[in-house]
């Protein structure tokens, strides 16, 4: 089963909703069933947010704002896109939906209670080991 950061199963808005999602994942897997999850790393957010970034893509420029609600461990993300060849205007970055971010330690605890064992974690699709200094957290787990 795949659970990707683009919201295929859910956007991880708050703990209550997330536990429902994690429970559905655990129940959907047979013993020995495999789960791969790709989310943003809460440990990274603790030390790197708030911040503003820009990304020059093939068709345009994206300006992003990452705000961090430390007490709730919640990311508030907003962005504005500019297409090349169009006039620029002063950016007004609107807040997006809140997203509760988790550390590997938190995911390990939550999954353990649901009968999922973390086998490995990565920082990207090349297999780089996860760390608190990488924004991406990929977790590979098995249903016990």
Segments from the language model and where they lie:
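Short, glycine/charged-enriched secondary-structure capping and boundary segments
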Residues: 16-19, 50-52
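SAM-dependent methyltransferase
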Residues: 36-109
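C-terminal lobe and adjacent flexible extensions of AdoMet/dcAdoMet transferase-like proteins
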Residues: 98-144
């Amino acid at each position: 089963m795949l659970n990707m950061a683009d919201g295929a199963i859910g956007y991880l808005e708050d703990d209550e909703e997330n536990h429902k999602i994690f429970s559905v994942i655990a129940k959907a897997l047979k013993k020995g069933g495999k789960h791969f999850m790709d989310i943003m790393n809460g440990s990274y957010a603790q030390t790197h947010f708030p911040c503003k970034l820009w990304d020059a893509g093939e068709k345009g420029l994206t300006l992003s704002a990452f705000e961090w609600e430390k007490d709730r461990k919640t990311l508030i993300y907003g962005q504005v896109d500019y297409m090349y060849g169009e006039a620029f205007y002063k950016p007004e970055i609107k807040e997006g939906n809140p997203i509760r971010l988790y550390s590997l330690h938190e995911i390990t605890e939550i999954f353990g209670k649901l009968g999922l064992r973390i086998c490995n974690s990565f920082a990207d699709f090349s297999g780089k080991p996860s760390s608190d200094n990488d924004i991406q957290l990929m977790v590979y787990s098995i249903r016990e």
